[in-house]
Each structure stands twice: as structure tokens, then as C-alpha cells.
Amino acid sequence: MPRANEIKKGMVLNYNGKLLIVKNIDIQSPSARGAATLYKMRFSDVRTGLKVEERFKGDDIVDTVTLTRRFVDFSYVDGNEYVFMDKEDYTPYTFTKEQIEEELQFIPEGGMPDMQVLTWDGQLLALELPQTVDLEIIETAPGIKGASASSRTKPATMSTGLVIQVPEYLTTGEKIRIHIEECRYMGRAD
């Protein structure tokens, strides 16, 4: 079984009799000598959908669950439900808006490549996105000429409604690459 410092976002733990999907990990390094690094993990309970927060020391042993991953394409929206289709056998997977609220900020209209659903024992658990996504800026302050040498940033609204900080020289209509896990600008899209 892995230690807490080996856990990554998207993994599923069996903790206190609950299946918990790791949504976010904050690493807190203590300044005192000999103190253990703390891992504050935010989870979503698979069965109830409730958010759970737990702290672990880096060398704590945790029980992980092996999941089945299937590549999917976004298919359609039906009211409050989002339907994704398996790329191999065309099995539909349905999520409610609440289940994938965070992920929806990064999914452009028409979907994106390399999305996966995670299942365990035939039970649908989560939607996993690739590391990066290319989105179009639909609203930001006008670009400043000669600002490329500056490291100052400004807020920009993407086509999905996501707001992130981008360099000052970018303008409305440009496509940029965003790192999904860190929710940060990486560069212009190809």
C-alpha cells in the first residue's frame, strides 16, 4: 500500500469504510526540524457526493483502490445531466452537473480529447481530464503593447466561463493552453 506522499489527484482511497476520490492536495512543509510534512487532502465521497477533508503525514500508509479507466467523448446535455460515450463500445456514462462541476470549467463546447471515466466494480466514480486544455479568451482588458517583457498579469474569462490570470499582452479572441490541475496559463495554443 502506498504512503500519503505518493497519492495524486484523481486516485481513490478506501478510508474509514468510505471510497474517497482525491480532488485536491495541499502540501504543508513545517519549518521546525524533524516535523513531518503534512498532506491536506480534499476528497469527494463516491457514494454521497459530500466533500471530505483529511490530513495525513507523509509516511502514513493509505489504502488505494484500483480503478478501471475508459476513454470517452462528450455526447450531449440532458437537463442537469451530462452524457459521455465510451470510445470503444459506445456505453453511455451519465454525470449530474454537481458531480462534475469543477471539470465543466475546462471542457470546451464539443468536448476535448483524452477524457476518461473512472469506474470501480461497475460503479461510475469520476470524470478525469487530460493535463492541459486549449481555450479561447472571450473577455479581458485590452492588450498592452510592449508588455511582453513584463511579468504582470490580468484576469481573463475563457469560453467556458473559467477566469484565470494571463500575461498583459494577450487579447480577446486568442487561444491559450491552460494547465488543468494548477488552473494556470501555460502559453499560447498551437
From Swiss-Prot:
Under the GO molecular function aspect, what terms does this record hold?
A: translation elongation factor activity
Alphabetically, which GO biological process terms does the record hold? peptide biosynthetic process
| Alphabetized SUPFAM superfamilies for the sequence | Nucleic acid-binding proteins, Translation proteins SH3-like domain
Q: One Pfam family for this entry, by name?
A: EFP_N
Looking up PROSITE patterns in the UniProt record yields: EFP
- Family annotation (Gene3D superfamilies): 2.30.30.30, Nucleic acid-binding proteins (2.40.50.140)
Show the InterPro entries listed in the entry. Elong-fact-P_C (IPR015365), NA-bd_OB-fold (IPR012340), Rib_uL2_dom2 (IPR014722), Transl_elong_fac_P/YeiP (IPR020599), Transl_elong_KOW-like (IPR013185), Transl_elong_p-like_YeiP (IPR011897), Transl_elong_P/YeiP_cen (IPR001059), Transl_elong_P/YeiP_CS (IPR013852)
Give any Gene Ontology cellular component. cytosol
Similarity comment: family membership:
Belongs to the elongation factor P family.
Protein name (Swiss-Prot/TrEMBL): Elongation factor P-like protein
User: What is the source species?
Assistant: Klebsiella pneumoniae (strain 342)
